[in-house]
Amino acid sequence: LNVNSIMNGILPTVKIMKEQGYGCIINTSSMVSLCGQRSGIGYPTSKSAVNGLTWSLARELGPFNIRVNAVAPGITNTDMVASLPKEMIEPLKAAIPLRRVGEPEDIANAFLFLASDMASYVTGEILSVDGAMRT
């Protein structure tokens, strides 16, 4: 699902980006694509495939001035995380060196950076936004 939906979204737009001579693609990966997780192999495996797709497309599309990157969010304050019992949240926070979960704005800012001219020479990167949890 993760890779197929990304491919279905990217392929039609690549033609337009090539014609205009530039473009920027930012995929959504996950922290677990870089470090794995204990339970369930499907999600980290599919997100690892997103990373591979990102790296390959960066190499393939770079000559057309199309940058391809991904953001790998860590635990983020979403409705799903907010619904977890407090006794589950506190150990998660303790495992994050910044001692907090990320906010949606933290993730959005990573996307904004990669989409901006400040990242004009950044391609093929998986940007972790996880408070250093995976280190």
What spans do the regions from the language model cover?
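Conserved Rossmann-fold SDR core element
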Residues: N51, L61-T76, V122-V129
